[in-house]
Amino acid sequence: MEEELPLFSGDSGKPVQATLSSLKMLDVGKWPIFSLCSEEELQLIRQACVFGSAGNEVLYTTVNDEIFVLGTNCCGCLGLGDVQSTIEPRRLDSLNGKKIACLSYGSGPHIVLATTEGEVFTWGHNAYSQLGNGTTNHGLVPCHISTNLSNKQVIEVACGSYHSLVLTSDGEVFAWGYNNSGQVGSGSTVNQPIPRRVTGCLQNKVVVTIACGQMCCMAVVDTGEVYVWGYNGNGQLGLGNSGNQPTPCRVAALQGIRVQRVACGYAHTLVLTDEGQVYAWGANSYGQLGTGNKSNQSYPTPVTVEKDRIIEIAACHSTHTSAAKTQGGHVYMWGQCRGQSVILPHLTHFSCTDDVFACFATPAVTWRLLSVEPDDHLTVAESLKREFDNPDTADLKFLVDGKYIYAHKVLLKIRCEHFRSSLEDNEDDIVEMSEFSYPVYRAFLEYLYTDSISLSPEEAVGLLDLATFYRENRLKKLCQQTIKQGICEENAIALLSAAVKYDAQDLEEFCFRFCINHLTVVTQTSGFAEMDHDLLKNFISKASRVGAFKN
């Protein structure tokens, strides 16, 4: 039965009825500010950001791409053209037709927003030119910022307390706003009224991600190096001292470590490496470094969460809270927690890091733009996904390791050449399978229904074997992508061997590069000691050609 739900539409911006068969909801109920919204309004939220000094400002988009705001509207941060507070959602008409790609906020607060087209809009507090429009007047409505960005596509934005940072698709970083500690990276301490490219050590680098603390900036380049600049009074730049840095400087203590992500709290920094390890440095008065004490650290310090690989880190410049998520789905938090100091990573009952900031952080803000894809009808692909392993509609079952997996002959024949021939004249409704394990074979069949895989990197090696055996090239590519996420120094040689065995060239090159980047440790592992002779010979030859053994 179809369900009737309200959709915002019309000149008034009030809900009108529309019929939807199903709808994915973004879970925002843990943030107190959303208690001001009706259940009907909450059902329509697709993206959301909570900000402000008390978590008292909200911007969200609906499933039909309208933007709404509510809150105290401090300094016009809601972009409505006035400074009137509102406890009811008001539509932000000035951004009508724009789709939000990413968004960040400052302490004033001010907002920096990038659209899916790569345009930048800013509004709100502007006493330090953090809006980048060349003035110090507060912006009551969104202003398109094009100076020095007119031919650029912005793909990521970040805000400090009163400065702004953006990253373009070609790996360039632009900054503007408050610069008393060098946080704009211009080499001076003069405020920057318009976007200016951050150069110096970044001049010939390709930046892949950025982050801002209250008064500092971080940039990760494509080689995995981290560059930092700005205020350093708490050691948040990780340079081993407390001196401010007016231009980008590489974090030398991370030499040989490839960083993938960076996140900044009020005055502390977290990074995530390609091996799933977290390092932290900076202020630690609330235990936000997770080191077991409250002593500041000016050098990167490992954070021990658990043996499982970390896949996500989270921090926000307006809080002293840290969070991380493991590959197994466990979420940990540490730092300031509702008036308490948690000095070691603490396992929560949450399934996402966003909930840590809703429930434990002060203020209760979002550390990133929350987002969920709209789902206003069931596609053919979604219908097929629902029917996988459904005994009610299946006409075939596989017996693997004593367990049944239910499937549909016609779909298997459509999706897989192997089944097209093997099931052609087969009238049996049970197929016994002993060549592969239950998790691997179930993942294979599920892939035929969903075009995706959900296995751990370790199990994906077995699926890679199956994909090679059945000549499923797309599945083979997906397996390689999954396996890459689980590589570490201890298993790198084993994964390299598997890549060679199953002729997975992309994975082979990835594993080889990983081994070269971590050569000293990899060559001391048991996997390297037990390496096949021919593989070892080829590895040494190839490593020599890329200069791995040069002094």
Curated annotation (Swiss-Prot):
Residues 394-457 form the BTB domain. GO terms for molecular function: guanyl-nucleotide exchange factor activity. It is found in: Cytoplasmic vesicle, Secretory vesicle, Acrosome. One of its GO terms (cellular component) is acrosomal vesicle. PROSITE patterns: BTB (PS50097), RCC1_2 (PS00626), RCC1_3 (PS50012). Keywords: Cytoplasmic vesicle, Repeat. It comes from the Eukaryota. RCC1 repeats lie at residues 64-115, 117-169, 171-222, 223-274, 276-326, 328-382. GO terms for biological process: cell population proliferation; digestive tract development; liver development; lymph node development; spleen development. Its main location: cytoplasm. InterPro entries: BTB/POZ_dom, RCC1/BLIP-II, Reg_chr_condens, Signaling_Regulatory_Domain, SKP1/BTB/POZ_sf. It holds the Pfam family BTB. The BTB domain might play a role in targeting to acrosomal vesicles. PANTHER family: BTK-BINDING PROTEIN-RELATED (PTHR22872), RCC1 AND BTB DOMAIN CONTAINING PROTEIN 2 (PTHR22872:SF3). This is RCC1 and BTB domain-containing protein 2. It comes from Homo sapiens (Human). The gene is RCBTB2.
